[in-house]
């Protein structure tokens, strides 16, 4: 449970549309009336007002202090898998934040490390949903190593490496499995792999536990389009891309029960 004698410090991120901005401003006013403190630099709680894209933005803005910051979402967008609240519940949420100790739920993250042929400094990223790897042009050809052993040579459009919470995003559209976020794992899913008499891939999603590392090694020296959640990055002279379950975790503030499978049902099946 999160609550100390010191006033809770909060920040709000908004989708930027009129409805979200008005809701965010109203929440800020109400919470300040409860003597909570607003600080965009070092918040205890970040309130995301919008859709899943807004929460992804908030996550990357505060990914340097994940051990100190928890997130809660208010859904005003098209898809709100990460959001527990809707605008009609604004006053109920404000009172809960101001008066109720909240439970912190931690979910696994994906760590992506990109190393370069020139031996320069490596680039390291954290993903809440997924990392995708594609060639800028042509077919992606990658050697896939698991725990240091060559597993396959992949040929196709690309690869998607997702977290358990991210398994409901792009990974699901690719036919990957939905993983419960209590599982410390990542999932590797193919995008339109080439399979014929000459070339073979496993053709199935791979679920790797926390102590397994997936290493992608380019066969050809080409440029890569690599996405980390909503961020799209062009990388040249790539030697390898290492993917593993991160040591860090994302923390969500829960003011009421919202079981994962109910969240999945509400997002994809329920009317």
UniProtKB/Swiss-Prot annotation:
Catalyzed reactions per annotation: NAD(+) + ATP = ADP + NADP(+) + H(+)
Cofactor: a divalent metal cation
Swiss-Prot/TrEMBL keywords: ATP-binding, Cytoplasm, Kinase, NAD, NADP, Nucleotide-binding, Transferase
Single GO term (MF): NAD+ kinase activity
Pfam families according to UniProt: NAD_kinase, NAD_kinase_C
EC top class named in words: transferase
Subcellular location: Cytoplasm
Keyword hit for Methyltransferase: no
The keyword Aminoacyl-tRNA synthetase appears for this protein: no
Active site: 52 (proton acceptor)
Binding locations of NAD(+): 52-53, 129-130, 155, 157, 192
InterPro entries assigned: ATP-NAD_kinase_N, ATP-NAD_kinase_PpnK-typ_C, NAD/diacylglycerol_kinase_sf, NADK
HAMAP family for this protein: NAD_kinase
Record's function text: Involved in the regulation of the intracellular balance of NAD and NADP, and is a key enzyme in the biosynthesis of NADP. Catalyzes specifically the phosphorylation on 2'-hydroxyl of the adenosine moiety of NAD to yield NADP.
NCBIfam families linked to this entry: PRK04885.1
Protein name as annotated: NAD kinase 1
Protein source organism: Geobacillus kaustophilus (strain HTA426)
């Amino acid at each position: 449970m999160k609550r100390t004698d010191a006033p809770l410090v909060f920040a709000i991120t908004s989708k930027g549309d009129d409805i979200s901005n008005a809701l965010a401003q109203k929440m800020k006013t109400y919470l300040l009336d409860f003597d909570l403190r607003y600080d965009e630099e070092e918040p205890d709680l970040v309130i995301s007002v919008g859709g899943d894209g807004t929460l992804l933005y908030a996550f990357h803005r505060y990914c340097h202090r994940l051990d100190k910051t928890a997130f809660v979402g208010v859904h005003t967008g098209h898809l709100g898998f990460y959001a527990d609240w809707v605008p009609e519940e604004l006053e109920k949420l404000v009172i809960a934040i101001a008066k109720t100790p909240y439970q912190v739920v931690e979910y696994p993250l994906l760590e992506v490390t990109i190393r370069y042929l020139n031996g320069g400094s490596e680039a390291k990223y954290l993903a809440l949903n997924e990392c995708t790897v594609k060639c800028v042009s042509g077919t992606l050809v990658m050697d896939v190593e698991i725990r240091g052993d060559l597993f396959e040579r992949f040929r196709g459009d690309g690869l998607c490496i997702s977290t358990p919470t991210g398994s409901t995003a792009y990974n699901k559209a690719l036919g990957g499995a939905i993983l419960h976020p209590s599982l410390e794992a990542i999932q590797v899913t193919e995008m339109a792999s080439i399979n014929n008499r000459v070339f073979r891939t496993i053709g199935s999603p791979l679920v790797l536990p926390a102590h397994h590392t997936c290493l992608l090694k380019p066969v050809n020296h080409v440029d890569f389009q690599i996405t980390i959640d909503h961020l799209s990055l062009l990388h040249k002279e790539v030697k390898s891309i290492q993917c593993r379950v991160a040591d860090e975790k994302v923390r969500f503030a829960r003011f009421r029960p919202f079981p994962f499978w109910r969240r999945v049902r509400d997002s994809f099946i329920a009317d």
